[in-house]
């Protein structure tokens, strides 16, 4: 099975859990291919950085508000957006405090799964999936890369980078450490997130006499007409060692917008 790009000298399979491991590796230097009881992972789950982001995946208050774990600032004693965590938690999934969150790496993994699904649906509802397959500044836009980028700077920053009308130039494309979203999109591309809808299908590549064609480089061209994006996309790709060629669907079947 193919792996993603190296992150702190480690790479992970291009699966949903591989994506979770890779994001955690980048955010907190953990290694979730090891037991959660490993000191490396225990320490990573308790991290709170200088900007107030917490845990294995460096969540901020806004993300945990979106997921229903931390009370919204409007209904909380914590009225700031500074990731100071001085307010009240909702109690969802047994997490009633910052301490509860930091001491439970297994629940943090559950939460990142919920976050992936949340962002997948949000990006679809905002038609950002129309940009999947497009090349921007030399980087192909994929679902996993886009979700990682939204985790870094929010969907506003992602929309700005993609050039979505109403977003372009109105949101920051870099985080508080000056990491640009393009780095995350490139680093976390091509993972199969296995959720939201079946984004990826596989085509078995055969030659004219029926032989399976393995590790064959080729170029795919497609046309798409959506709310924001009407264009032809060209992507260079390669069949794997079984002759399978991954094809990413830009939108869910029930939206009737196919690759």
Regions from the language model: what does each represent?
Residues 57-58:
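Short glycine- and hydrophobic/aromatic-rich loop-to-beta-strand nucleating segment
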Residues 226-245:
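Short, acidic Ser/Thr/Gly-rich low-complexity loop/linker segments typical of extracellular
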